[in-house]
């Protein structure tokens, strides 16, 4: 089974995420031993950010890494697990609120595709970049 990184690299809808993970130096982490739960913003999600945001973040790898690790939780958590928990802690250290009442939402993002299995975790595709705070 492919890793989280392999799945992202081989899916055209994640080119911005892949470039950001590379710029932040997180490829080895997300390709390595898991398990991780990744809330993966697609390219459309990154396109919603204000102009210049991605370029600014790529030039600041520590800040970019902090934002990206806010999209990752330890463990292999399915949609059902996440909805039951109501909140998870990101590997960045901040809580991520989960809402499953109407749509399946992660903070300010709606999950477009849930429970994509990888050998080192699980991916949930989201429609917004989730921001801390």
From Swiss-Prot:
Domain FAS1: 1-130
Organism placement in taxonomy: Bacteria, Bacillati, Cyanobacteriota, Cyanophyceae, Oscillatoriophycideae
Protein name in the entry: Uncharacterized protein SYNPCC7002_A0175
One GO cellular component term noted in the UniProt record for this chain: extracellular space
Domain of life: Bacteria
């Amino acid at each position: 089974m492919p890793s989280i990184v392999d799945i992202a690299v081989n899916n055209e809808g994640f080119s911005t995420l892949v470039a950001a993970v590379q710029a932040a130096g997180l490829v080895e982490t997300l390709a390595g031993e898991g398990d991780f739960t990744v809330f993966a913003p697609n390219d459309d999600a990154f396109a919603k950010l204000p102009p210049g945001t991605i370029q600014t973040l790529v030039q600041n790898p520590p800040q970019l890494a902090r934002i990206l690790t806010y999209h990752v939780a330890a463990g292999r958590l399915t949609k059902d697990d996440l909805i039951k928990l109501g909140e998870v802690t990101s590997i960045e250290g901040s809580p991520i609120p989960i809402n499953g009442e109407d749509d399946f939402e992660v903070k300010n993002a709606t999950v477009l595709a849930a429970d994509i299995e990888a050998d080192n975790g699980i991916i949930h595709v989201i429609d917004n970049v989730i921001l801390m705070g």
